[in-house]
Amino acid sequence: MNQKTINILIDPQIFNEQKFGGISRYYTEIYAALKNKEGVEVNCPLLYTENIHFKESPLFNTSFQKKNAFLINYSKVFRPFLPRKLKKKNAREFISLLKAQEFDLFVPTYYNTDFLRYLGNKPFVLTVYDMIHELFPQYFLEDRDTVPNKKTLMEKATKIIAISESTKTDILSIYPHIDARKIEVVYLAHSIKTASNIKLDLPKKYILFVGNRLFYKNFIFFLRVVSPILKANPDLYLVCAGGNAFNDEEQELINNLNINSQILQKNFLDTELANYYQGAQCFVFPSAYEGFGIPVLEAMACGCPVILADHSSFPEVAGNAGIYFELNNAEDLSNKLNQLLENNNLRTEYKHKGLIQADKFNWQKTAEACLNIYKKSI
């Protein structure tokens, strides 16, 4: 007997909002993994997107590209007005599919609640990536929608996917009335490209920091810790990959610490990121909180030793392959960093541990785990 095909509708919300980012990466990988799976029909009404992850995926190179070749090829010509118009078209197409009710399960990609008015009695599975807005409200004063919208969706969802045990614990700590039985943990993975032969203008010896540097990422704290280490090692640099140019606060502190000549900010392509990791003495991730922490996996997959806080989801991701410091303890971080920089054998040990740990995570596992939860929700 043939198994009944499961029809899953994914909303285009995150692909409209993000040009790149962890959430759109997650849904691109899930969508791509399930798209050609037997017994599964996945639909995401995405008539147009500027999302880089989607454009680099097999989804873009097949039906998406063929159906929208004109828009893709000529969007630069119409750049001033076309994206907004096409995103509205995405929304209209999405609403029409919701109203048609020809699906078994709905998967929202973020926390907009508008779909609820059209959903009827159809089940939906919500992924919760973190509880940053709830735990650090001082950093999101202008965002008045995310917290109440997320709460509403968590209460109404058939199932909730949390991307770490840490995130699940945070959900239940903040909202103890939510049924713990409907929350299941599914780990993410990484999509790091293999290091290429591209020649990058990077120093011979450097510590690596990757991504956003604001607020709970603890970059200012890290700058103060790394400053004396840089001064004691004139041939050592700090490379900040991504995150845009240093802001006024960062630049002022760099000037005051007198370490301008040993700090570089570099923007990168996805195809270059592995080179940054592989060339580094170590990767430092001083963040106070992450729902998961994909950069930790990326670094380990590239054989780059990782120093990170013993907090949040990090022990779940790095396991015994991480070198942990006590959160916000400057002396502890400084000691761990010096130990690693001064000991080649220790770096080699954690390089190998990291490769083994990173190999435990892949998007196929993530997609299969999500699909099992989707099936249980119908």
Describe the function of each predicted region.
Residues 1-378:
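Carbohydrate transferase catalytic cores enriched for Leloir-type hexosyltransferases
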